[in-house]
């Protein structure tokens, strides 16, 4: 079938709006009509050429919502007409990782997904007879996409797709990191480095967890109003100080902050976040994705004296079983999604959405099909 899509033909170049061909779903696959998709920093990261798994030409997009159109052989968990959110972190329930109960990092389709292919090692997308790669198992920058069954969460059909599409990545990642990875407790102190969608979601999650002091940190003070709305008690612009941000935080509490979250992908900030964590028990959670080949460093004594360095992917959330409940929470108002959507646009305007992101003028732009 034909589908309008925003295709990245090469790194560092604007997306091109073209009509592509989408092949029918094969065994274990599902064809979806995407209704809405967020434009995420991860899409921009891959488009920049810095992503070690980036392949081109590719249909980007991984933060979407849509409706099932057709199912392939053997698909039983969804049917045509079901409302779904595609998952870049699949959940088969059968692999060693899923059976362990210790992680949300399923490996059922990970190997082929990282190569931009469907589980059988081929692609369902083509343009003028030439294959196009998939992206993170989702490719929501196409009006129609094909996704593995294990990479779909079935959701309440009454949910507002313009808002709940954000649960496909950024908001779930931030809120989940608070509850599942850090396990923030009432009264704990929290510092959030970077106030994009993920960082703001961490702030909201910290408020849900009844954290005591919630410190929001960003060099763009325009982010502070929304951070306070979500629950920040303090907002800090590192550029306002003539000393490292670590020292600013240690002035607040000389022993450090209970939980710090790096939501940028800057290895220097990752170190600062760890070294701002509380001596004896503080933990720092890395959420941001650093560029290809970059490494983190610190003095081992930082860990010897009780600090813990952790990472979090998709907030530790198991998408197929847990994401539908988060959609219900959003519908009840327990998760506030609307403020994240600062702009809505058509697919034809998608490059403007990337410009707004790079200029720091948006939190999330949602594309409506």
From Swiss-Prot:
Belongs to the zinc-containing alcohol dehydrogenase family. Class-III subfamily. PANTHER family: ALCOHOL DEHYDROGENASE (PTHR43880), ALCOHOL DEHYDROGENASE CLASS-3 (PTHR43880:SF12). Binds 2 Zn(2+) ions per subunit. GO terms for biological process: formaldehyde catabolic process. Its cofactor is Zn(2+). It is found in: Cytoplasm. InterPro entries: ADH-like_C, ADH-like_N, ADH_3, ADH_Zn_CS, GroES-like_sf, NAD(P)-bd_dom_sf, PKS_ER. It catalyses: S-(hydroxymethyl)glutathione + NADP(+) = S-formylglutathione + NADPH + H(+); S-(hydroxymethyl)glutathione + NAD(+) = S-formylglutathione + NADH + H(+); a primary alcohol + NAD(+) = an aldehyde + NADH + H(+); a secondary alcohol + NAD(+) = a ketone + NADH + H(+). Its main location: cytoplasm. It holds the Pfam family ADH_zinc_N. The gene is frmA. Keywords: Cytoplasm, Metal-binding, NAD, Oxidoreductase, Zinc. Homodimer. Gene3D superfamilies: Medium-chain alcohol dehydrogenases, catalytic domain, NAD(P)-binding Rossmann-like Domain. This is S-(hydroxymethyl)glutathione dehydrogenase. Zn(2+) 1 binds at residues 40, 62, 169. It comes from Escherichia coli O6:H1 (strain CFT073 / ATCC 700928 / UPEC). The lineage of its organism: Bacteria, Pseudomonadati, Pseudomonadota, Gammaproteobacteria, Enterobacterales. Signal peptide: none annotated.
């Amino acid at each position: 079938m034909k589908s309008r899509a925003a295709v990245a033909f090469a790194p560092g170049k604007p997306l091109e709006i073209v009509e592509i061909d989408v092949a029918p779903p094969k065994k274990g696959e599902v064809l979806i009509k995407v209704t809405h998709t967020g434009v995420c920093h991860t899409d921009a990261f891959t488009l920049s050429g810095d992503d070690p798994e980036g392949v081109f030409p590719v249909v980007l997009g991984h933060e979407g919502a849509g409706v099932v159109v057709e199912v392939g052989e053997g698909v039983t968990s969804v049917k045509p007409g079901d409302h779904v959110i595609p998952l870049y972190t699949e959940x088969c329930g059968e692999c060693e990782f899923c059976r362990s109960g210790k992680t949300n990092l399923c490996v059922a389709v990970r190997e082929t997904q990282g190569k931009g292919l469907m589980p059988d090692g081929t692609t369902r997308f083509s343009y003028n007879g030439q294959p196009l790669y998939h992206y993170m198992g989702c490719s929501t920058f196409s009006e129609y996409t094909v996704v593995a069954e294990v990479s779909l969460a079935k959701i309440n059909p009454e949910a507002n797709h313009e808002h709940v599409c954000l649960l496909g990545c950024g908001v779930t990642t931030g809120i989940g990191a608070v509850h599942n990875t850090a396990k923030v407790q009432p009264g704990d102190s929290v510092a959030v480095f970077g106030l994009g969608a993920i960082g703001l979601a961490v702030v909201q999650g910290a408020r849900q967890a009844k954290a005591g002091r919630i410190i929001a940190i960003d060099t763009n003070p325009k982010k502070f109003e929304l951070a306070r709305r979500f629950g920040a008690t303090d907002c800090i612009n590192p550029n306002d100080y003539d000393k490292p941000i670590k020292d600013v935080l240690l002035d607040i509490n000389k022993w450090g902050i209970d939980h710090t979250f790096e939501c940028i992908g800057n290895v220097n900030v990752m170190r600062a976040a760890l070294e701002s964590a509380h001596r004896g028990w503080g933990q720092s959670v890395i959420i941001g994705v650093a560029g290809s080949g970059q490494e983190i460093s610190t003095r081992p004594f930082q860990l010897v004296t009780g600090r813990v360095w952790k990472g979090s992917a998709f907030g530790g959330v198991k998408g197929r079983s847990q994401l539908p409940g988060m959609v219900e929470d959003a519908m009840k108002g327990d998760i506030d999604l609307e403020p994240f959507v600062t702009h809505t646009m058509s697919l034809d305007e998608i490059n403007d959405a990337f410009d707004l992101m790079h200029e720091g003028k948006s939190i999330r732009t949602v594309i409506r099909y």
